[in-house]
């Protein structure tokens, strides 16, 4: 796939403006193509980042810690790959280490990388969990994402208070219900 130039991308924005009945040469829209491209570069910056690079910094001196570690309430905004409309919500991550841990900010960075791509919530849930599982090789990973989807509120069925929840478990969380319950009870108290 050949990546379009910045000028080609700006022309595509002008084409979309004409498609919806706007005049891209009117004063209020003259700089819009450039602004859209700048915002897309920021919004979709996850494509230029490698999650495994973030997960390379591990700590092996865990004092034999083999209990639940969680980071709750990680806010995100992403864009659905079907309509390129935003969906935003909260991610809760937990894992039980085997012999290493990562810095707490790394979990939030993982969410940032995957949410700054065209996504569907189900795929993002799996990607976050599997990247942690692959890198840290913990006893298990648990993820819950709750999100509001603009493609449900701005178009189609027009339901603006619907929340979509996805959960994904690996290892001990997938195998033993008691660990899933511990995770869900832990985040329910939030």
UniProtKB/Swiss-Prot annotation:
InterPro entries found in the cross-reference section: GTP-CH-I_C/QueF, GTP-CH-I_N, GTP_CycHdrlase_I, GTP_CycHdrlase_I_CS, GTP_CycHdrlase_I_dom
Listed Pfam families: GTP_cyclohydroI (PF01227)
Cited PROSITE patterns: GTP_CYCLOHYDROL_1_1, GTP_CYCLOHYDROL_1_2
One annotated GO biological process: tetrahydrofolate biosynthetic process
GO cellular component: cytoplasm
MF terms (GO), sorted A to Z: GTP binding; GTP cyclohydrolase I activity; zinc ion binding
Pathway membership: Cofactor biosynthesis; 7,8-dihydroneopterin triphosphate biosynthesis; 7,8-dihydroneopterin triphosphate from GTP: step 1/1
Reaction(s) this enzyme catalyzes, per UniProt: GTP + H2O = 7,8-dihydroneopterin 3'-triphosphate + formate + H(+)
Alphabetic keyword roster: GTP-binding, Hydrolase, Metal-binding, Nucleotide-binding, One-carbon metabolism, Zinc
UniProt binding sites for Zn(2+): 80, 83, 151
NCBIfam families registered for this protein in UniProt: folE, PRK09347.1-2, PRK09347.1-3
Assembly information from the UniProt record: Toroid-shaped homodecamer, composed of two pentamers of five dimers.
Protein known as: GTP cyclohydrolase 1
Gene name per UniProt: folE
